[in-house]
């Protein structure tokens, strides 16, 4: 109810400014205790995925809280799990502003943030200070100036750093806003990366006395052969999960709209069908070998249900929150039960 009142005012602001304003005020509400008055979503059936017990299947996708600065506030909205990041070894400013654009006629968002973040050490200080005891995923990436030939070093650095703090780790090789990042999805490069990460995961599990699952986040702009290759590599290297999908470079569904030709990744409702198709394809190739977390274009409980029917075990939201607000979590929980 409250979000529907403030949304018209927020939409008058620059999209990134509205994003930051909302998070800062949500944090103020949490610190004042007023967020405790927000009604919790209905009870959902718990899910066990990647060996983790998720209190409900609705998660927050990476990108909203890049530095883990708002975990406690976001937890008050009833998510079954929260994913923070994408984080890189060193701080970086990301791409020049403006870099986030709404397409309200299509309920879409375009962003070209470029992994703007304060670096992995700042994120870990924020995580250490949180009161949150729920399921926390940490999404890791490479710095923009790290060449792909050395990308594995950035991912391993972040994996070692976040391992003691995360319930699961997501490897982001699918953002369209870091030059050549998606080339890491190609068969040879991906095989080398997965092999190195899997080896390090076992070393860290022995070192810390606990196993932290690793998931791979992939793009929606893949053909059937590419999806098949990725699925085969995930199974070969015994990865724990896959998140489908990131944002799309396609514009065919919004090409006539203002801002549609802005560079960056498109998310929200225009991504829905493309994302679901990748989930269905992955599900066919994986045949239950590892779980899928579905994300992309979820703006209702019915949208989430379609992801589950396509083969996802859990779902995540981000752009849907821009248009629906926190009631979206409640809607999905009621639909999925």
UniProtKB/Swiss-Prot annotation:
GO terms classed as biological process: 'de novo' pyrimidine nucleobase biosynthetic process; 'de novo' UMP biosynthetic process
Cofactor (UniProt): FMN
Localization (cell): Cell membrane
Gene3D superfamilies: Aldolase class I
InterPro entries per the UniProt record, alphabetical: Aldolase_TIM, DHO_dehydrogenase, Dihydroorotate_DH_1_2, Dihydroorotate_DH_2, Dihydroorotate_DH_cat, Dihydroorotate_DH_CS
Topology relative to the membrane: Peripheral membrane protein
EC class: oxidoreductase
Documented EC number(s): 1.3.5.2
Protein family membership: Belongs to the dihydroorotate dehydrogenase family. Type 2 subfamily.
Record note on quaternary structure: Monomer.
Job of this protein: Catalyzes the conversion of dihydroorotate to orotate with quinone as electron acceptor.
Protein name as annotated: Dihydroorotate dehydrogenase (quinone)
